[in-house]
Regions:
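N-terminal glycine-rich phosphate-binding loop for ADP-containing cofactors
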Residues: 1-152
Length: 152
């Protein structure tokens, strides 16, 4: 859901974090927190999921450069099998490539088709995009004197 339709690589968010390195997530977060004003909305999002990230790092599950991350490749009878981490249990199981929401299939038709859907997946994507765009608008004065300089 959080991939190409919203302008991210086709890997999606979690596979992208595996590629970059999960061990970098807390370092980037700490760096941002130390440099941002206290009223910056970024401070509100730090924390959720932190326990999962830290336990993954402690286990050596730092992504592709480690034993795995949110995903890992395993071998079964000589064939590569993609596994996904269950965020509740921490166990890996065969990745289910079937879309969980009808809106996920609509994403192939573009963002507006995805957002026109009425399911939890589309609502999640809409919430993420609205929060992201609101944050981008909030930081415009720190980046530029006007929005036109950014957009042009």
């Amino acid at each position: 859901m959080l991939g190409r339709p919203i302008g991210l690589p086709k890997t999606g968010v979690f596979a992208l974090m595996d590629l970059i390195g999960i061990d970098l997530i807390p370092k980037v977060g700490e760096s941002l927190q130390s440099r941002l004003d206290q009223e910056d909305p970024f401070h509100k999002i730090s924390g959720p999921g932190e326990d999962i990230i830290m336990s993954m790092i402690e286990e050596g599950n730092t992504g592709r450069k480690g034993k795995g991350g949110f995903y890992r490749l395993n071998r079964d009878d000589g064939k590569k099998v993609k596994e996904a981490r269950d965020l509740s249990s921490g166990e890996y199981r065969k990745a289910n490539r079937k879309a969980a929401f009808p809106s996920a299939k609509m994403g192939k038709r573009g963002l507006s088709a995805l957002m026109d859907c009425d399911d939890d997946g589309a609502r999640f994507v809409t919430d993420v995009l609205l929060d992201t765009l609101a944050y981008a608008a909030f930081i415009v004065p720190d980046v530029s004197d006007d929005i036109y300089s950014i957009d042009g």
